Amino acid sequence: MIASSVKAEVVKSNARSANDTGSPEVQVALLTARINELTPHFKQHAKDHHGRRGLLRMVSRRRKLLDYLKSKDADRYTALIAKLGLRK
């Protein structure tokens, strides 16, 4: 679980306007923060298959949001993946 201060910082740094909490950019950034926080857990606990299912669900949801953003506005998509360091 992400600390509320970290979550607020992620929202603030990726928001398109002052009160923006639901744009695809913010949602992808929050999912990325949660995924990055869970990744070390699975390095230590390789047999946690129930938790891994939740992680894969988050990755899938992030992928769908990125696909949506790419189809709607490719410039915002490329800026977001560069900012989050998702693709090479």
UniProtKB/Swiss-Prot annotation:
Record's Gene Ontology CC terms?
cytosolic small ribosomal subunit
Q: Supply the alphabetized keyword list.
A: Ribonucleoprotein, Ribosomal protein, RNA-binding, rRNA-binding
**Positions with biased composition (Polar residues):** 14-23
Q: Where is this region: Disordered?
A: 1-23
Respond yes or no to whether keyword Ribonucleoprotein is given for this record. Answer: yes
The yes or no answer to whether the keyword Kinase is present is: no
Q: Name one Pfam family in it.
A: Ribosomal_S15
Single biological process term from Gene Ontology? translation
Belongs to which family? Belongs to the universal ribosomal protein uS15 family.
Per its database record, what is this protein's job? One of the primary rRNA binding proteins, it binds directly to 16S rRNA where it helps nucleate assembly of the platform of the 30S subunit by binding and bridging several RNA helices of the 16S rRNA.
- Name by which UniProt lists this protein: Small ribosomal subunit protein uS15
Q: Please report the organism this UniProt entry assigns to the protein.
A: Delftia acidovorans (strain DSM 14801 / SPH-1)
